[in-house]
Amino acid sequence: MIDIHSHIVFDVDDGPKSREESKALLAESYRQGVRTIVSTSHRRKGMFETPEEKIAENFLQVREIAKEVADDLVIAYGAEIYYTLDALEKLEKKEIPTLNDSRYALIEFSMHTSYRQIHTGLSNILMLGITPVIAHIERYDALENNEKRVRELIDMGCYTQINSYHVSKPKFFGEKYKFMKKRARYFLERDLVHVVASDMHNLDSRPPYMQQAYDIIAKKYGAKKAKELFVDNPRKIIMDQLI
């Protein structure tokens, strides 16, 4: 499997705090069957403003750590970019990375961003010649149960990603993110998802869940669909090919 959304670099955002935590995440991801991970540390003005130099420096250390986990574990560079005009300017100047230096960039918004703002932001990115991969589409209230809006964004030239955890079945009690799991299922059932990725941050509250999600999708939608969402489409993204 190929995971294009992850927080594996230590001490740069709300992901791992130490080299040891980074290594534990990589090892668990590998155990689940992931062989390529794109590191997408947060870039968000006012919340995650770690200098690019430090992110790059720590990333290179994580790439070395990956060699200790397995010879065939590949770590690529990227970013999860919270959309602002500042981020748009940095993308234009190539000051923040796309996914593995491809045409694709992982873009996020706040849960409560209006559809108009989402549409405008993604249009602005497309005008730079960059193809947005919309991070965890199940989070956005403006897209909830709205096939028309998601199709409109796809028709514009965007791609969509959902988190592996939200593929799993909601628990009966105490499930904080039950509504996101329902949204993810809605999008999957309508064939509105291009990629499933982990968005892993740590082993305690936000582990990978990739193997579990793969198995659920293979069982419910078929092995071909699972391969498309976890292997084929992510590979095309990091190889800078059209999906």
From Swiss-Prot:
Its EC number is 3.1.3.48. Its cofactor is Mn(2+). Coiled coil: none annotated. This is Tyrosine-protein phosphatase CpsB. Dephosphorylates CpsD. Involved in the regulation of capsular polysaccharide biosynthesis. Belongs to the metallo-dependent hydrolases superfamily. CpsB/CapC family. One of its GO terms (molecular function) is manganese ion binding. Pathway: Capsule biogenesis; capsule polysaccharide biosynthesis. Changing residue 201 to Q: Loss of activity. Keywords: Capsule biogenesis/degradation, Exopolysaccharide synthesis, Hydrolase, Manganese, Protein phosphatase. Pfam families: CpsB_CapC. It comes from Streptococcus pneumoniae. NCBIfam families: caps_synth_Cps4B (NF041488). One of its GO terms (biological process) is capsule polysaccharide biosynthetic process. Gene3D superfamilies: Metal-dependent hydrolases. It catalyses: O-phospho-L-tyrosyl-[protein] + H2O = L-tyrosyl-[protein] + phosphate.
